[in-house]
């Protein structure tokens, strides 16, 4: 059986991930006109720029959908977002600012839940709006086939017939109007935006040029913290975790994690927290650039890692960061539910997150400018009295440290001998100032 269909399967049921925008609206109508039987599936991911989800399936039926369903994915999305925080599953960072993999998390949830809904309806062909140059085409491919082994893939944007007839947004708009729908193109922005409850991605068009900065972006989850005319008063916020799970913000508990994440977004968003500019490597190894928002994820991540550093030992923290980066890359590649990812997730959640209980108080200012005001946990291994500089009882004495210095550093003689050995072989040059060999000046290399 062919997995990827290059042309429209006339007379067959096709499920399309339907956003209600021009692209998917025109594609659905075109498929119906050409003799396919389209079904529309819309994921409610709590997009901050979507105000009427119920209207989307109605529009799909107007455009010819045989059936249209709205799938509430918010609970599962937040659950996966919290799991990513517990595991530190983030591998793209620039200057200490993190991309929280919010789009890959959204694709993991959308790709599995929509295809599961299609399977319930006897729909085994899936189409979506991803292009062949991006990451999503592979993410959806993997998650779709993982959920339904009999799935076939049909993407109008890979069909030469569709491209020849409706290759651009202007052609799509004219097609909709010609079919009796008064569909006006929205005003073109200088970039494209994709969002869910966890975060927003701004990319493409003007943002493909590195001399276009965050200043051309209108945040949809935060504020223009770079604009000095925007008043942003400082704000204290307390975040509480129990066994790795965020349970309270400013002492307030929530009926469910969705409400908690919405409140975290509101708090962080008031300051522009979690906004970053990243150059990243796509799955196909080409570099792309995105500007990201994730105010709630950033707030929870900061508090979580503060507790982490106060509770766990150095080796555990090192493994958390190493495995978290590895897991983040798997998530980015559409492998969040693969066995190698599940192994890392289980280890990090079981042995790291389970001990993260406590409260962190922060002062948020502008953008990613914040201070940690207090850290409280019964699980802290940080003990001020162990290293106090004041007189009093101590867990060890000066004599103890003398012994430690002697035993811990017996290799100094070995290291000195190696340095002189490197000098004799020409890897290092002699230094008259210190008496020890030193790394040769690269400018003199080969002279």
From Swiss-Prot:
It catalyses: L-citrulline + L-aspartate + ATP = 2-(N(omega)-L-arginino)succinate + AMP + diphosphate + H(+). PROSITE patterns: ARGININOSUCCIN_SYN_1 (PS00564), ARGININOSUCCIN_SYN_2 (PS00565). One of its GO terms (molecular function) is ATP binding. Keywords: Amino-acid biosynthesis, Arginine biosynthesis, ATP-binding, Cytoplasm, Ligase, Nucleotide-binding. It is found in: Cytoplasm. One of its GO terms (cellular component) is cytoplasm. It comes from the Bacteria. GO terms for biological process: argininosuccinate metabolic process; L-arginine biosynthetic process; urea cycle. ATP binds at residues 17-25, 43, 129, 131, 136, 194. Pathway: Amino-acid biosynthesis; L-arginine biosynthesis; L-arginine from L-ornithine and carbamoyl phosphate: step 2/3. L-citrulline binds at residues 99, 135, 139, 192, 201, 203, 280. HAMAP family: Arg_succ_synth_type2. Homotetramer. This is Argininosuccinate synthase.
């Amino acid at each position: 059986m062919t997995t990827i269909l290059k042309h429209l399967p006339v007379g067959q049921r096709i499920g399309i991930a339907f956003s209600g925008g021009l692209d998917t609206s025109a594609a659905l109508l075109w498929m119906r006109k050409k003799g396919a039987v389209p079904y529309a599936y819309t994921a409610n991911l709590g997009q901050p720029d979507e105000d009427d989800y119920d209207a989307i399936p109605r529009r799909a039926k107007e455009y010819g959908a045989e059936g249209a369903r709205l799938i509430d994915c918010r609970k599962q999305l937040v659950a996966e977002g919290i799991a990513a925080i517990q595991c530190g599953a983030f591998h793209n960072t620039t200057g200490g600012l993190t991309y929280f993999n919010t789009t890959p998390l959204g694709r993991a949830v959308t790709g599995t839940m929509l295809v599961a809904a299609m399977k319930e309806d006897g729909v085994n062909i899936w189409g979506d709006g991803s292009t062949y140059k991006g990451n999503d085409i592979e993410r959806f491919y993997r998650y779709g086939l993982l959920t339904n082994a009999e799935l076939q893939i049909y993407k109008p944007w890979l069909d030469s017939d569709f491209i020849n007839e409706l290759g651009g947004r202007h052609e799509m708009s004219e097609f909709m109007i010609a079919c009796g729908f008064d569909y006006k193109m929205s005003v073109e922005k200088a970039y494209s935006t994709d969002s869910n409850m966890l975060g927003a991605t701004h990319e493409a068009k003007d943002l493909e040029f590195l001399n276009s900065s965050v200043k051309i972006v209108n945040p949809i989850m935060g504020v223009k913290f770079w604009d000095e005319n925007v008043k942003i008063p400082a704000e204290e916020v307390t975040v509480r975790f129990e066994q790795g799970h965020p349970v309270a913000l400013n002492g307030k508990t929530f009926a469910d994690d969705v409400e908690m994440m919405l409140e975290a977004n509101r708090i962080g968003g008031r300051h522009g927290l979690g906004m970053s500019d990243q150059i990243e490597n796509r799955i196909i190894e080409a570099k792309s650039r995105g500007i990201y928002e994730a105010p709630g994820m950033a707030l929870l991540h900061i508090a979580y890692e503060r507790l982490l550093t106060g509770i766990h030992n150095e080796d555990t923290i090192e493994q958390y960061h190493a495995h978290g980066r590895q897991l983040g890359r798997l998530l980015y590649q559409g492998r969040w539910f693969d066995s190698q990812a599940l192994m890392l997730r289980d280890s990090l959640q079981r042995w790291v997150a389970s001990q993260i209980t406590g409260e962190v108080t922060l002062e948020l200012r502008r953008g990613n400018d914040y201070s940690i005001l207090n850290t409280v946990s019964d699980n802290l291994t940080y003990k001020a009295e162990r290293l106090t500089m004041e007189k009093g009882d101590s867990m060890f004495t000066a004599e103890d440290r003398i012994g430690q210095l002697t035993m811990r550093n017996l290799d100094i003689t070995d290291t000195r001998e190696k340095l002189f050995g490197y000098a004799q072989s020409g890897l290092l040059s002699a230094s008259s100032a210190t008496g020890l060999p030193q790394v040769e000046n690269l400018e003199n290399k080969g002279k």
